[in-house]
């Protein structure tokens, strides 16, 4: 299979359905309503053709004609600028800076923990990391409750960071109970019901999470 970048007339996303970074980008593409070809990549069997596109052999990788991008944050910000409607970043520079800092902190503080879990979900280290992640998110219950979405009344790239993380935790059986749990479950219900989220997972998400045990 030849996957030369400059011969592709339709945008292509090289993705792994189980990779949360790829999931971020799929949500953005769905929000923007951008037609694209989805190429599922097995991280254990990387082809030479793919290595020609991305020498780091990581996913997600986006090909837009002769442009090849990797790193989910770079891809998402490119898509938001390339397709400005609906906007997924604030207009004002100060607010954009705050959004970027929030995404950086989510990646450093929370994604680092889920990465430990994904390596070996049954290990002692993974269970400890998952418990820590749950507790840290519950501690921000008031932040989840304060606005319609995370620190904003508009759906944004920050939510595209948080949604795949919460989806992964949901699939691992994590229950958000106790203080902060109600707000997080309300947020999950709202985000998981968005059309873009359903498209990003290739099917329907749970309709309502508020019936879970408090």
From Swiss-Prot:
GO CC aspect terms: cytoplasm
Residue ranges constituting the GST N-terminal domain according to the UniProt record: 9-87
GST C-terminal domain residues: 92-209
A Pfam match: GST_C
InterPro entries in the record: Glutathione-S-Trfase_C-like, Glutathione-S-Trfase_C_sf, Glutathione_S-Trfase, Glutathione_S-Trfase_N, GST_C, GST_Omega/HSP26, SspA_C, SspA_N
Biological function: Forms an equimolar complex with the RNA polymerase holoenzyme (RNAP) but not with the core enzyme.
UniProt family annotation: Belongs to the GST superfamily. HSP26 family.
Name listed for the protein in its UniProt record: Stringent starvation protein A homolog
Record organism: Haemophilus ducreyi (strain 35000HP / ATCC 700724)
